[in-house]
């Protein structure tokens, strides 16, 4: 009975979020919000309506981290070869041009890709829906996605989701 109620609440909440954000976001921002962010926020808030906040967060993290691990297989595969690393770097730097971030590339050559993000749609939407703890989950997901590549080392000291002024991404070529 609780599961049915959560699912019903989730669907209604997600539809409401879609209607709300479609008017506020650009088409590219809305596409990312719809496919990657709002589904997690709606899930979390729906579970939270039926259980304690920390339990809702634990369930949402478990679901999200499983999805990230599955998706990270392609990144890990790309990170096994020189060509894959080059393609990863080019694709990532291209993606940074989207209006879902405000970013500054500090270095992009065959040795490394280093950039800062000072505005992020994930953070903006988590703040909008008053769930900053979920933004930390999204930030932590980067470690699952990028933390175990053979030829590229991922480093980051700061994240917007943890209250810092920026997210500092650094991918450095390494020999293993």
Where do the PLM segments sit?
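Amphipathic interaction/junction segments at domain boundaries or subunit interfaces
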Residues: 32-130
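C-terminal non-catalytic interaction appendages of large macromolecular assemblies
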Residues: 113, 124-125, 129-176
């Amino acid at each position: 009975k609780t599961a049915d109620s959560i699912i019903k609440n989730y669907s209604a909440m997600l539809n409401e979020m879609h209607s709300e954000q479609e008017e506020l976001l650009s088409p590219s921002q809305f596409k990312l919000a719809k496919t990657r962010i709002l589904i997690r926020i709606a899930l979390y808030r729906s579970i939270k309506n039926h259980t304690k906040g920390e339990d809702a967060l634990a369930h949402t993290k478990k679901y999200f981290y499983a999805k990230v691990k599955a998706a990270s297989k392609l990144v890990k595969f790309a990170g096994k070869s020189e060509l894959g690393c080059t393609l990863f770097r080019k694709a990532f730097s291209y993606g940074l041009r989207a209006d879902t971030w405000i970013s500054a590339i500090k270095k992009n050559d065959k040795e490394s890709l280093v950039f800062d993000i000072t505005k992020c749609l994930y953070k903006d939407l988590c703040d909008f829906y008053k769930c900053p703890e979920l933004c930390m989950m999204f930030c932590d997901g980067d470690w699952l996605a990028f933390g175990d590549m053979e030829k590229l080392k991922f480093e980051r000291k700061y994240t917007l989701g943890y209250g810092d002024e920026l997210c500092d991404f650094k991918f450095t070529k390494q020999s293993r």
